Amino acid sequence: MSMQNTANTIEELELLDFTFGGDAFGRLADGKPVFVPFGLPGELVRVQIPQEKPDYCLGRLVEILTPSPKRIQARCPHFTECGGCHYQHLAYEHQLEVKHKIVTDQMRRIGKIIEPAVNPVVPSAAEWNYRNTMQFHLSPSGKPGFKDITGERVVEITECHLPVPGVNEVWPNLDIEAGIGINRVMLRAGTDGDVLAGLEGALDRPPELKLDMPISLHYLGRGQDFLMAGDAYSVMTVNGVDFTVSPRSFFQVNLPQAEAMVKYVLANCGATHESTVLDLYCGVGLFSRFLAPLVTALAGVELSESACNDFALNLDAFDNVSLYVGKVEDIASSIEIHPDLVILDPPRAGLDKRVVAYLAESTAKRLVYVSCDPATLARDCKRLTAGGFSIESIQPFDLFPQTFHVETVVLMSQA
């Protein structure tokens, strides 16, 4: 198997293992690690090395001299050129093994847990066509695509096997004139199948567009958003509950796995009718909506204005719920409740040190930490255990087949 070679420096090496981020890695003769996208451990390869960094090298696969027996044919012709997928060359059961090992390694190396007891990864029911939301970049000619692995250019695509059918029926028909200020298009399919498009641009007002598809259309501008056609929001149904989700609000892209994760949290968080719950980074209320009818009081904290508005709609029926708007690290210590259960679902950057300090000093006896980044999760678990919490369980969920991403739920308690 050969790939385009544009560099002057070529090295032959054996790939040793996977790293978090999807790359395989090997070592040069001097021991310096080389990170190689789309390689597999055990393969003997030739890689180009355009430039050496002080502590590592980034390599590009030129030729596979000895392929791994685990290597399979990728489904998508854009694989290795488009940066959206990382593991299409690996059968799904092996993808799950890699993700389990990555979570375990991060907990051991960064979290300093000697023997992390990581449960088997909960697999996705669908390996393909599972994403209800997609972000398409536009090429200079206005065609949809994704950034390449360098993030420097947009690769125009003719097919994609990650979106749900509703999204896949729309994106190939996107025809946006180049140079009118639109740089990205978000497509989201609600549970009812209705598709909402969010056009992201740098202009204050939307350009003139002709809509010839039965979809809802929003312009997400620099200072203001505009509803141009159709519905103001999508409806996403999780475990029989409908959620209002606006175009700028985050929601889990794999609904069946979101349902599994919610069920797991509810079954293991220890919430009772006497519980007081604090839901930090609560988003549109995915966990709060199911906890609110079970507990005495619940408070959510969220920075996103769009998500806060959706949270208010989704939790409107409950008198025991309050919402605090702002950065968690700025306002957590001033919240006027004394939680015994805290739900954490932060962005990839994880917890600010001030949040960790607040939790260590709080009345919380149980934490549920939902993470999309094993490295920052491991770092935060180390800090939280130093603050008096102990880890009860580590449960990964695969919400993102064909990619290196993995969601992990960690249950923690404090005496």
PLM regions: where:
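Short, acidic/hydrophobic/Gly-rich beta-strand patch recurrent on exposed beta strands
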Residues: 24-29, 145-149, 198, 311
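Short, solvent-exposed loop/turn elements at beta->coil junctions and helix N-caps
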Residues: 119-126, 187-188, 223-225, 396-399
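Extended interfacial segments that mediate partner engagement and assembly in macromolecular machines
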Residues: 62-74, 80-182
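Short acidic-glycine loop/turn motifs at beta-strand connectors
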Residues: 29-30, 53, 138-143, 149-151, ...
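Carbohydrate-binding surface patches
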Residues: 187-202
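Terminal RNA-binding accessory module
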Residues: 1-78
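Rossmann-like S-adenosyl-L-methionine
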Residues: 2-12, 20, 24, 177, ...
